[in-house]
Regions:
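Short glycine-/Asp-/Thr-/Trp-enriched loop segments that recur within the blades
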Residues: 55-62, 114-119
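Beta-propeller and closely related beta-sheet repeat lectin domains
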Residues: 9-10, 62-65, 119-122
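Accessory, usually C-terminal, subdomains that scaffold auxiliary metal cofactors
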Residues: 60-67, 73-77, 81-107
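Membrane-proximal basic amphipathic "stem/tether" segments
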Residues: 134-160
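Hydrophobic core segments of beta-strands in well-ordered, beta-rich domains
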Residues: 9-26, 34-35, 72-80, 91, ...
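Short, small-residue-biased leader/transition segments that mark boundaries at the very start
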Residues: 1-8
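Structural motif
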Residues: 27-36, 82-94, 141-144
Length: 160
Protein backbone atom coordinates (compact mmCIF):
# COMPACT_ATOMS: atom_id res chain seq x y z
CA UNK A 1 0.00 0.00 0.00
CA UNK A 2 3.05 2.25 0.07
CA UNK A 3 3.34 4.89 -2.61
CA UNK A 4 -0.38 5.15 -3.29
CA UNK A 5 -0.64 8.58 -1.67
CA UNK A 6 -3.85 7.71 0.12
CA UNK A 7 -5.10 8.41 3.62
CA UNK A 8 -7.36 6.58 6.07
CA UNK A 9 -6.71 3.20 4.47
CA UNK A 10 -8.63 0.06 5.40
CA UNK A 11 -7.89 -3.40 4.04
CA UNK A 12 -10.16 -6.40 3.69
CA UNK A 13 -9.96 -9.86 2.09
CA UNK A 14 -12.99 -10.71 -0.05
CA UNK A 15 -13.58 -12.91 -3.12
CA UNK A 16 -10.00 -14.21 -3.14
CA UNK A 17 -8.39 -10.76 -3.28
CA UNK A 18 -7.10 -8.11 -0.91
CA UNK A 19 -8.95 -4.81 -1.20
CA UNK A 20 -7.65 -1.47 0.00
CA UNK A 21 -10.15 1.34 0.61
CA UNK A 22 -9.19 4.92 1.37
CA UNK A 23 -9.22 8.56 0.49
CA UNK A 24 -6.61 10.47 -1.41
CA UNK A 25 -4.75 13.46 -0.05
CA UNK A 26 -6.30 16.61 -1.46
CA UNK A 27 -9.76 15.11 -2.04
CA UNK A 28 -11.05 16.52 1.28
CA UNK A 29 -12.36 13.04 2.18
CA UNK A 30 -15.31 13.40 -0.19
CA UNK A 31 -14.22 10.46 -2.33
CA UNK A 32 -13.62 6.80 -1.47
CA UNK A 33 -11.09 4.93 -3.62
CA UNK A 34 -10.50 1.22 -4.12
CA UNK A 35 -7.31 -0.70 -4.95
CA UNK A 36 -6.77 -4.45 -5.36
CA UNK A 37 -3.95 -6.96 -4.74
CA UNK A 38 -3.86 -10.58 -5.87
CA UNK A 39 -0.83 -11.44 -3.73
CA UNK A 40 -1.19 -10.62 -0.07
CA UNK A 41 -2.06 -7.80 2.24
CA UNK A 42 1.31 -6.13 1.54
CA UNK A 43 1.19 -6.93 -2.19
CA UNK A 44 1.27 -4.70 -5.21
CA UNK A 45 -2.00 -2.81 -5.27
CA UNK A 46 -3.49 -1.68 -8.56
CA UNK A 47 -4.53 0.46 -10.31
CA UNK A 48 -2.04 3.02 -9.02
CA UNK A 49 -4.61 5.87 -9.23
CA UNK A 50 -7.34 3.80 -7.57
CA UNK A 51 -10.97 3.52 -8.61
CA UNK A 52 -13.40 6.05 -7.14
CA UNK A 53 -16.33 4.04 -5.74
CA UNK A 54 -18.15 6.72 -3.72
CA UNK A 55 -18.45 10.52 -3.71
CA UNK A 56 -19.96 12.86 -1.16
CA UNK A 57 -19.65 13.88 2.47
CA UNK A 58 -21.92 11.08 3.67
CA UNK A 59 -20.19 7.74 3.42
CA UNK A 60 -16.87 8.41 1.69
CA UNK A 61 -14.69 8.71 4.78
CA UNK A 62 -14.01 5.42 6.57
CA UNK A 63 -15.11 5.15 10.22
CA UNK A 64 -13.28 1.99 11.24
CA UNK A 65 -12.39 -1.48 10.03
CA UNK A 66 -14.63 -3.70 7.95
CA UNK A 67 -16.46 -6.33 9.97
CA UNK A 68 -18.51 -9.45 9.34
CA UNK A 69 -21.77 -10.66 10.82
CA UNK A 70 -22.80 -14.20 9.83
CA UNK A 71 -20.28 -14.06 6.98
CA UNK A 72 -21.68 -10.82 5.51
CA UNK A 73 -19.20 -7.96 5.04
CA UNK A 74 -20.01 -4.48 6.44
CA UNK A 75 -18.26 -1.12 6.04
CA UNK A 76 -18.51 1.69 8.60
CA UNK A 77 -18.28 5.25 7.27
CA UNK A 78 -18.63 8.77 8.60
CA UNK A 79 -21.54 11.09 7.99
CA UNK A 80 -19.73 14.41 7.46
CA UNK A 81 -22.66 16.36 5.99
CA UNK A 82 -22.98 18.59 9.06
CA UNK A 83 -19.31 18.38 10.10
CA UNK A 84 -16.47 15.89 10.47
CA UNK A 85 -17.68 12.67 12.05
CA UNK A 86 -21.18 13.85 12.98
CA UNK A 87 -22.38 10.26 12.79
CA UNK A 88 -21.55 6.77 11.61
CA UNK A 89 -23.25 4.99 8.72
CA UNK A 90 -23.02 1.19 8.41
CA UNK A 91 -23.13 -0.22 4.88
CA UNK A 92 -23.69 -3.84 3.82
CA UNK A 93 -21.16 -4.60 1.06
CA UNK A 94 -23.20 -6.23 -1.71
CA UNK A 95 -20.51 -6.47 -4.40
CA UNK A 96 -16.81 -5.60 -4.63
CA UNK A 97 -14.67 -5.66 -7.76
CA UNK A 98 -12.70 -3.09 -9.74
CA UNK A 99 -15.61 -2.89 -12.17
CA UNK A 100 -18.43 -2.77 -9.66
CA UNK A 101 -18.81 -1.75 -6.03
CA UNK A 102 -22.25 -1.78 -4.44
CA UNK A 103 -23.35 -1.30 -0.87
CA UNK A 104 -26.63 -0.80 0.97
CA UNK A 105 -27.14 1.43 4.01
CA UNK A 106 -28.29 -0.68 6.97
CA UNK A 107 -27.77 1.48 10.07
CA UNK A 108 -26.99 5.02 11.20
CA UNK A 109 -25.57 5.98 14.60
CA UNK A 110 -25.66 9.50 16.04
CA UNK A 111 -24.73 10.64 19.55
CA UNK A 112 -27.25 11.47 22.22
CA UNK A 113 -27.41 15.29 22.62
CA UNK A 114 -26.85 15.17 26.39
CA UNK A 115 -24.01 12.64 26.34
CA UNK A 116 -20.36 13.44 27.08
CA UNK A 117 -19.73 13.32 23.32
CA UNK A 118 -22.73 15.09 21.77
CA UNK A 119 -21.07 16.25 18.55
CA UNK A 120 -20.29 13.04 16.74
CA UNK A 121 -19.51 9.36 16.51
CA UNK A 122 -16.69 9.06 14.00
CA UNK A 123 -15.14 5.62 14.60
CA UNK A 124 -16.54 2.18 15.36
CA UNK A 125 -14.54 -1.06 15.59
CA UNK A 126 -15.35 -4.60 16.67
CA UNK A 127 -13.12 -7.33 18.08
CA UNK A 128 -14.45 -10.58 19.51
CA UNK A 129 -17.12 -9.47 22.01
CA UNK A 130 -15.95 -5.85 22.10
CA UNK A 131 -17.26 -2.77 20.32
CA UNK A 132 -15.28 0.46 20.58
CA UNK A 133 -16.82 3.78 19.52
CA UNK A 134 -14.93 7.07 19.37
CA UNK A 135 -17.12 10.06 20.16
CA UNK A 136 -16.60 13.73 19.45
CA UNK A 137 -17.03 16.76 21.69
CA UNK A 138 -16.32 20.06 19.97
CA UNK A 139 -15.43 22.76 22.45
CA UNK A 140 -15.87 26.35 21.28
CA UNK A 141 -12.43 27.76 20.56
CA UNK A 142 -11.92 31.13 18.90
CA UNK A 143 -8.42 30.31 17.61
CA UNK A 144 -9.37 26.89 16.24
CA UNK A 145 -12.34 28.38 14.38
CA UNK A 146 -10.15 31.07 12.88
CA UNK A 147 -7.52 28.55 11.84
CA UNK A 148 -10.19 26.33 10.32
CA UNK A 149 -11.48 29.21 8.19
CA UNK A 150 -7.93 30.11 7.07
CA UNK A 151 -7.18 26.47 6.34
CA UNK A 152 -10.29 26.13 4.15
CA UNK A 153 -9.60 29.40 2.32
CA UNK A 154 -5.90 28.84 1.65
CA UNK A 155 -5.58 25.03 1.79
CA UNK A 156 -2.90 25.09 4.50
CA UNK A 157 -3.42 21.48 5.54
CA UNK A 158 -3.78 22.05 9.31
CA UNK A 159 -6.78 19.74 9.58
CA UNK A 160 -5.93 17.08 6.94
Amino acid sequence: SRGLGDVYKRQVYENGKYWLFGGKKGCDQEELYLWCSDDNIWGNYYPKEGVCVKKGLRGSRMAGDFFRVNGQLYRPSQDCLEHYGAGTVIWCVDSVSLDRYEETEVAVLYPQPRSNYPDGLHTINFSDNWCVIDGLHIKPDFWRGGLLRLDKKFGLGFFD
